[in-house]
Amino acid sequence: MKKICDLDVEKYRCITPDIPTKEVIITDERIQHIKNHHPGHFEVIEPYLKTALEAPDYILEDAPNTGLVLKTIYENGLRLQLVLRIHTSADSPEFKNSVISAWKISEPRWNNYLRNKKILYKSE
């Protein structure tokens, strides 16, 4: 398990108002999942996970207590998406906010998400 950062809880209340912890982690199992399902992506996006969570461009609606976080890294044009599961008071107390998956996305996919998914948060 690796800690990525602490959330700005107010920013992420658009997913759920019930956020008892700030800590965001990614487990070794989830890292392996990303490597298996999106070969070559983890090594490219890992340095930007903290930035994406701290300063997302968009947070989109997903499953309950889960958001799709979109971030463009302007110095290299990388667009990344990550799936963030928010820990709520109904979850086991030892759980944390966690990155479920993450990968690079293309500009057409990015635009498709913005057209077809509900935008919960947009950076200014």
Describe each PLM feature range.
Residues 1-124:
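Ribonuclease/tRNase effector modules and their secretory precursors
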